[in-house]
Structure formats: structure tokens, C-alpha cells
Amino acid sequence: MDTIPKARTPNVEAREKVVILFAGDSGDGIQLTGSQFTDSNALFGNDVSTFPNYPAEIRAPQGTTAGVSGFQLHFGSVDVFTPGDMCDTLVVMNAAALKVNLHKLKKGGIIIANSDGFDGKNLRLAGYADEKNPLTDGSLDNYVLHPVDVTKLTRNALEGTTLGMKEKDRSKNMFVLGFIHWMYGRKIEGPEKFLEAKFKTKPELLEANRKVLRAGYNFGDTSETFTTRFEVKPAPMPKGTYRNITGNQGVAIGLIAAAQKAGLELFYGSYPITPASDILHELSRNKHFGVKTFQAEDEIAAVCAAIGASYGGALGATASSGPGIALKTEALGLAVMLEIPLVVVNVQRGGPSTGMPTKTEQADLWQAVHGRNGEAPIPVIAASSPTDCFEMAYEAVKTAVEHMTPVILLTDGYMANGAEPWRFPEAKDLRPIVPPFAKPRDTDEAEGGTLSAAEGRVLSEVEAFLPYARDERGVRPWAIPGMKGLQHRIGGIEKEDKTGNISYDPLNHQRMVDLRAEKVNMIADGFRPIRLDSGPESGELLIVGWGSTYGAIRTAALDLQKEGHSVAHVHLRHLFPFNKGLRGLLQRYRKVLVPEMNKGQLRQLLRAEFLVDAQGLNKVQGLPFTAQEIRNAVLELLAR
């Protein structure tokens, strides 16, 4: 039994919401600490939003600012839409983590610093002049500073174990996790269950981490330094079953749910790339749903395998980030020509080229809409949050299957790795997905035409299977190889209308280009009517957003509306083709602002399509917008 010192009764301060930022070296277990505390708050009933911020280098020199890993969590008893602009509590494991993140802490905020990470060496590596220690030089007097020797306390907790010093020090994050659970009144049963699952085959490591976790909690209970705990009550949420979900998990579960609803096997062809790889990991854990995952040798093989799976009657899907999507481009043109279902997920990151793999961006919109040779229209949709990734992945499948077309779903690194509570939908509430399968026919293929197996004669065009005959939506039938009488040609060379034979006829090419474009345009007929996310139906200014800018825009818009400003917010999920009601909506406002993490790609599409004088707010720093940045831009535009 662990010896538990006598507890005292601290003050309890109620908070509506809290933003906490964990930061340290990439080997300090920061992401695990943040994700476990997030899970505890989600299970408690708080609304949560997270922002894991990874260093760009796989393992930067220890103790340097380049190697700082961060995890920001916003949790509350009210709706939470962003990870927060500024944090209330900053937990840092070394001097570099403080230097990188101090500007994100509110004045008067709490700093919990591992004092062992502020020795001379760490101060030099972090770039503090003359090894000046911020924990002792008075520079942090505007904050509530709590230096804690986490390293020493962790080693003390593991005294008497057979673990080496390095193994003991790897448990430091468990001390921090235990203490933070005490500080915010959360039980540690959740992290203990996690440890039991993680170390079930390593009892010594299980016991060590559990000891340190409890030591951190008990430290808060007995230390005279910490006199206040914080209480954040559960948020009112609709009844149902919830789990914490990241954007990549949402995409994976959405693909599975849609494939099940459509009665199709899901085939996912992928090549590992940051930040999309977790989709492959999640799908590979769900093979009991009939999911087939294939890790290809390169991006081209991955997408071509997915196309082949769709040709064979499965739901083909693939994912990548910008550089990988560039490699898939020729194959996407093939999928357009074949007119078969294919879901392509682009988890956007900082570019161009290799760019900043661990940082977020929205700069692949033009690539998605226009990035293929020839006239090759593909529907493009975008998710707005981790939970919306489920909805939009499901919609991507529905569109791809029912309209026989590839579909591009845009997410980004921010929402892919961020998490929020997700309510499990009822299967009956999911919209039906009906594949347009062709029916088998009593015919055989023969040179020069199609033969009737029963009569041994060449069929007329009326009687023969026409793979490119279309229904009223412009959709061709899905003919599965091996089905009797449905033999037809495929390939990337232009097809003859209806028959699918190879054709170089000029007028036929014009017709096929027009038919493919019309089919994609008609998809907009099935969109739900466009609606505002908040604000008046007409007025002074409309904020038009897309993708992961949703939370920051919504937070800013709601605050501005409360202050009496004539500001509305609409968030676009259909980026090509646009919703048919968008033109009329844009015309009802004097000014339009488009915040996006690129140099104005959606803004220019809106200008080209609707001749609207849209103004841009553009950020390409590898970081998401804050609500304050949106607010400042709106007020500036209103004042013009």
C-alpha cells in the first residue's frame, strides 16, 4: 500500500470553463498527458476541444525550443468551440517550453513548472541570456508561479523499485497527470484503467506508473503550496452514448458506417503520411466490419488499388496530405473517366512540397477543385470539426456511390488530431445509401457486338448493355465484373456515349465532357438548403468560413452578436459545386469576410463564381485562427 499523507481541505473556486496547456520536450509524454486529461474531462461530462501541437522535427535536440511539444485543452460546463485563445494554466517541463508558450498565458494565470528543467544546461539550450532563470528573477511576477521539482518527486515515489534512473524519469508525466486531476477535481480511475491496459504484460511498469500517478494526486492533496482547487461542472448535453473522437477517427468511423449502410465492403488503400496516417491505423483496428486495409508501396499504388476495388464492387477509399494528393492526380483523372465511386481524403498540412508536415493549413482547396489535367470535375466537400469529420465522410461516400464519381473530402491537421465529444448516432437516423448496380443480363460478349446467349444473334443497341447510359441524374450504372451480360470496356481513353467504346470523335468528346460536368453540377440539387450558423438573415457583414476555422469564427460571431453588431456566420461544407442558395445569401449583406488558412483560395472562388467583393483574412503560420483574430478583423471591416 502507498503511504498517503494527511489531506487538507483546500479552497474550491468555480469556473465556467478552463484552458490548460501542457508543454515539454517531445519525449516528455506531453501528448499522452493531454489526451488522458481530455478523456477524464469528457467522461466527467464537460464539453472539450483540443489542439495537439507537435514539433516539426521527429526528435529535435532535447531542451531546445525546436523540440517543444504542446497539448492545449479547453473544457467547460458550456459549449466549447475552440481550444481557447489564451490559457488559464500553463504546465511546463523545462525552460524551452516556458519560452515558447509564455505569451499564450493570461496575465495572472497559473504556471506549474518542473524546476529540474530550469538548470543551467536547460536555460542555455532554451536561449535565456546569461542563464537567467525566469523562476527566480522576478520576470514572472505577473503570474501565479508554482515551481515543483517533478523529477525529484517522481524518483522519490519510485524509491525501492528495480527501475533505472531513465525509466523512472519517463514516468514524470504521470506525476503531472495525477496532480492536474487533483487540481481540477477529477478522479484518476480513468488513467489507471488506461495504464492497466497499456502495461498489462509489464507489471513492473504498470505498478511504477500507477505509483507516480497517485503520488502526483496526493502531492496536491497535501502540499501547502496549492491552496485552491477548481470546479468545472458538467455541460448540459443531449442524452446518448458519447466518446471522445479525433478528426481522423471520425473519418474512419464515417467511412465504415457508410459502407455498412450501402451494403459494401470497404477497401482502404493508403501510404503513410503525416497527418493522415491515423485513418489507416483506426480502420485496421476495425476489420471485423469487413474493412480491408492495404498499405501500398507509394501514393500512386494506393489510389490505383482503391480504384480497382471500386471497379470490383467494393467501396474504394484512400487518404493522404498535399504532396501525396499531387502524386495521386493522374489516377484521379482516371477515376473521373471511369465514373466509379472513390473517396479521397486530403488531411491538409503546411506546404508547398514537404512543407511543415506537423503543422496545419488550408492551402489545398485549389488543388482539390482544379488540380487535374483536362476537364475533370470532382465534387469537393470539407469537414468543420472532429465530429463533423464523421458526417462529411459519410456524405462523401453517399455522393460517390449514388453519383458514380470520385469525391474529395478536405480536413486538416488541426481537426485531424484535435478531439471533442461525439454522440453515437442511431443507425436508423443515417441517410440511406443506394448503389446504382446494373442487373445481370442473359447475354454473352462476341466480336463485333453482343450476342444473345439464348438466340445466338447480335443484339441491337436497345438490347445491349450500355455502360454509359445515364439516368435522370446523369449517373451511369455500376457494373461489377463477372456479372452475366455486363461486359464492357474500361480505361482512361475517351469513351463513346452510351456504349463505352473507345472514341476520338470530336463531337462525342464534347458531349462526354459536358455530361460529366453536368452530372457533378446536378449533385447540388440534393444538397440540404443552405443555412446560417448564426446571426441575422441579412445585414451589415457575413463571415464565410470553411473547414477547421469553424470554432474560431463561431465563437467570435456569437460574441459580436451579443454586443449588438450586425454580423452573421455561414460555414460552407460544399466547395464544388457550391450550394445553390449561396448566391442569394451573399447578396443579402453589405460586406463579406472570408477567413482561411491560405492566401485567399475560397475568397477568389467566390469572387469568380458570384462576383462578390469578398474580403480576406489570411493566415499561413501553421497555426489555427484564434477567435480574437477573427473578432479584430470583423471590427476593422465594419469600421470602414
Predicted regions and their residues:
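Active-site cofactor/cluster-binding pocket
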Residues: 2-262
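Thiamine diphosphate
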Residues: 17-106, 253, 266, 274-370, ...
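Short glycine-rich or small-residue beta-strand-to-loop segments that form or flank ligand, phosphate
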Residues: 18-25, 176-178, 266-269, 316-319, ...
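Flexible, low-complexity linker and terminal segments
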Residues: 237, 245-254, 262, 392, ...
